[in-house]
Amino acid sequence: MKYSIIQKDKTNYSTSAWSGGATTEIRIMPEGSRYADREFLWRLSSATVEVEESTFTALPDYDRLIMMLEGEMDLCHNNGPWIHLAEFVPHAFDGGDDTLSKGKVVDFNLMLRKGKCRGAVVPMVFSADVMEMASEKLVPDLKSCRDCMIYCHCGPLSVKMEDGREVELNAGESLQMSGDLTNAEWNFRSENSARAVIAAVWNV
């Protein structure tokens, strides 16, 4: 299995401005893909929404998973009822939906090509009462996924691999796992109330 730590800097992440704030691309696959071309398999990003109301970009070829890292948001899909999203609660929707939002937030996004892959966004919120978590309980079918990333929003977060190796992630850092994950067993620990996210992608 191949592990790589991605630091939050200009080399590894790219940030672009939009009318309501800024979006930081954490990872896009296949490597070398461009979001603007709309031909990528999956994309992981975090956006800062600095306006009270905004309209989501239509992405009809993609399924989307979104979660608030800071702040709360209300979403409306296709003129339906408004849905309230608290911090660290994942929400799935069709990228082709006509989607409106209310709320200034920092969010976390996973976009997945329809018919090609599926995914999950799993929150990890540590506290004085919860200082350890195990991957097999968080993502039961983790060992069959094709790609997995751990994003640390607030750290530090310690990640212990099945071979005993330990990696510490600080705020804004990611740990990417790819390759054969059939033996993957990870333990997460934080004594500082870390907040992190597991993003996993499977073939369909």
Briefly describe each language-model feature range:
Residues 1-204:
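Jelly-roll (double-stranded beta-helix
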